[in-house]
């Protein structure tokens, strides 16, 4: 689906260093995915190259890609080929963010990316499970467009991610797309900064009218992203 460059979902909003933090992906990895050795070799076609800046839709695609490459070191050329196949199939600039990817797209990606790669069938099931967990953190509007992303909080790292609580949200229409506590415009970076400055979790919870566990998770998430 083609959208206007002025669409909030398509506006360049996240520089690489910030996007890497939000996705908990190494900077060099994200750089490889989005710019590569040259723009033509990039897996994700980002909104702006000078400087490299991602739109919300780009961010969502990188989130899905992080799930796809979570367990198996699939070569980048094969990943790029698989994404290009999906791009043609869906006639979309952002195939990994499309609603259709949640149905037949995952299996197609795995088939395309793993041709001639020695990955067991059981490993493919694991990859599918990880990707589905990532996809469930994407909220869509009535038309199927990705509109919010709920990154995994620290508590979700050691538990099943499928039903992990959605405490932090990235919404392009709230706080300029910066991570906030769900249901608020309270930036997680502000909470982390104030905590570093000496404010306790209980005092922050009282001031903002939120549960202590939410404040704690936001601070720990920011710490892990640093």
Regions found by a protein language model. Give the residues of each.
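Major-groove DNA-recognition helix of helix-turn-helix-type DNA-binding domains
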Residues: 26-48
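Short, Lys/Arg-enriched anionic-surface-contact patches
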Residues: 1-6, 165-186
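Polyanion-binding surface elements
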Residues: 5-30
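Long, charge-rich, low-complexity alpha-helical segments
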Residues: 184-226
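Charged mid-protein connector segments
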Residues: 74-142
């Amino acid at each position: 689906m083609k959208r206007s460059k002025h669409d909030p979902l398509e506006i360049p909003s996240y520089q690489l260093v910030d996007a890497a933090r939000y996705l908990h992906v190494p900077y060099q990895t994200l750089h490889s995915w989005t710019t590569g050795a040259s723009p033509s070799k990039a897996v994700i076609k980002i909104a702006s190259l000078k400087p490299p800046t991602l739109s919300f839709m780009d961010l969502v695609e990188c989130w899905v890609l992080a799930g796809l490459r979570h367990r198996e070191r699939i070569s980048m050329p094969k990943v790029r080929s698989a994404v290009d196949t999906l791009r043609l199939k869906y006639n979309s600039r952002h195939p990994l963010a499309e609603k259709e990817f949640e149905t037949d797209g995952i299996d197609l990606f795995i088939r395309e990316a793993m041709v001639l790669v020695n990955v067991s069938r059981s490993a493919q099931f694991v990859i599918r499970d990880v990707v589905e967990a990532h996809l469930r953190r994407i909220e869509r509007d009535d038309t199927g467009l990705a509109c919010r992303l709920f990154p995994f909080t620290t508590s979700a790292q050691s538990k099943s991610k499928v039903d992990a609580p959605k405490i932090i949200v990235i919404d392009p229409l709230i706080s300029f797309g910066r991570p906030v506590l769900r249901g608020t415009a309270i930036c997680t970076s502000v909470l982390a900064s104030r905590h570093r400055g000496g404010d306790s979790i209980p005092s922050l919870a009282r001031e903002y009218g939120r549960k202590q566990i939410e404040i704690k998770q936001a601070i720990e998430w920011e710490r892990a992203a640093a």
